[in-house]
Amino acid sequence: MSGQGKRLMVMAGGTGGHVFPGLAVAHHLIAQGWEVRWLGTADRMEADLVPKHGIEIDFIRISGLRGKGIKALLAAPLRIFNAWRQARAIMKAFKPDVVLGMGGYVSGPGGLAAWSLGIPVVLHEQNGIAGLTNKWLAKIATKVMQAFPGAFPNAEVVGNPVRTDVLALPLPQQRLAGREGPIRVLVVGGSQGARILNQTMPLVAAKLGDTVTIWHQSGKGAQQIVEQAYADAGQPQHKVTEFIDDMAAAYAWADVVVCRSGALTVSEIAAAGLPAIFVPFQHKDRQQYWNALPLEKAGAAKIFEQPQFTVDAVASTLAGWSRETLLTMAERARAASVPDATERVANEVSRAARS
C-alpha cells in the first residue's frame, strides 16, 4: 500500500512505552513513502530519541497534571489552551492527512488541535488500562486501537508494535528444544532498575545454587551494589550489567525472564516467546498487573504482586519449572503475541487518511 505524498504526525512522549511503538509505525509508513513528523515535548526522552531515528520533531509545552499542587491545577486550563494553540500552528504548517496518538501528555492538546482542524485522529493504547489522555481523546477519535483487551470496551485489539530484531528471533521450538544445563534466568529491571529485583534475586540465586545461571540488568548506578549482593550470597559467578543494549540477544539467551510488566516489555516477551515471572509496579490503577494478566491466563507467565515476591516463593516457582514446562510456556507466550501489530496500526492510519 503506497503512501506516496501522504503525511502523518505522530504524537507520543514521555516514556519508551509510548515512543518506541510510535517509532515502529513511523518507520513502517516511511518505507511506504509517507512523510512523518513528530509532536513531543523538549524535556522528555523523545527530544533526543526521535531525531536519532531520522524523524523531525516539533515541540509543545505541556506536562502531566497527576500529583500536582493546587496552583498547578488552577493554571492547567491556560497551559492546555496554550499547548493546543502551539499544536494547531504546527499542524497548520505541516498539514498532516492523519495524526496518530500513542499516549503521553503531548497527545491531549495534539489530538484536540487535529480534531479542531478536521484532521482524523487515530489512537493506540499500549496498556491494559487506558491512560487519562486516551480516555478523553477516544470520544473524538476516528479510530481507537488497544494492545490488550479491556482498556476500551469496543476497541480493536491489535497488540503493541515491537522492534523488528525481537520479532526476527527463532521460534521457541528452534531456540530452546536442545538446551541443557542450568536454567538461564534473565532479570530485567528497566533503565532505572527495580529495587525489589535487585534485592531479592541474589538471595534466590543462593537458594537455587548451580541449577540456574543469571544475567541481571540492574539499572542505572546499581551494578556494583547488585554484584556485591550476589557475592555476599555466595553467588559471584552471575553476570550483572547496568544496561542491556541488545535486548533481542538477551531474550535469545534466556530460558525465562523475571521483570516488571510495562506494556512494551510484556509485548516483547510474548513476541520473543519466553516464559516470565512478572512483578507489576505498584500503581493505584494496577496498570502493569492488567498488562501481564493475559499471559498468565494463557499459561505463559506467573504474576507475583510485590508483597508476594519473596525469596522462597520465587525460588520454589523457578525450581518447579522443568525444561519441558518452560518450552510449553514459551510456545504459549509466542501464540499469545501479535507479530503483525505494526502493520495493523499502520493500516488503520492509512485507512483513516483516505476516509
UniProtKB/Swiss-Prot annotation:
It is a peripheral membrane protein. The gene is murG. UDP-N-acetyl-alpha-D-glucosamine binds at residues 15-17, 127, 163, 191, 244, 263-268, 288. Its main location: membrane. Pfam families: Glyco_tran_28_C, Glyco_transf_28. One of its GO terms (molecular function) is undecaprenyldiphospho-muramoylpentapeptide beta-N-acetylglucosaminyltransferase activity. The keyword Cell cycle applies. GO terms for biological process: carbohydrate metabolic process; cell division; cell wall organization; lipid glycosylation; peptidoglycan biosynthetic process; regulation of cell shape. Belongs to the glycosyltransferase 28 family. MurG subfamily. It catalyses: di-trans,octa-cis-undecaprenyl diphospho-N-acetyl-alpha-D-muramoyl-L-alanyl-D-glutamyl-meso-2,6-diaminopimeloyl-D-alanyl-D-alanine + UDP-N-acetyl-alpha-D-glucosamine = di-trans,octa-cis-undecaprenyl diphospho-[N-acetyl-alpha-D-glucosaminyl-(1->4)]-N-acetyl-alpha-D-muramoyl-L-alanyl-D-glutamyl-meso-2,6-diaminopimeloyl-D-alanyl-D-alanine + UDP + H(+). It comes from the Bacteria. Pathway: Cell wall biogenesis; peptidoglycan biosynthesis. This is UDP-N-acetylglucosamine--N-acetylmuramyl-(pentapeptide) pyrophosphoryl-undecaprenol N-acetylglucosamine transferase.
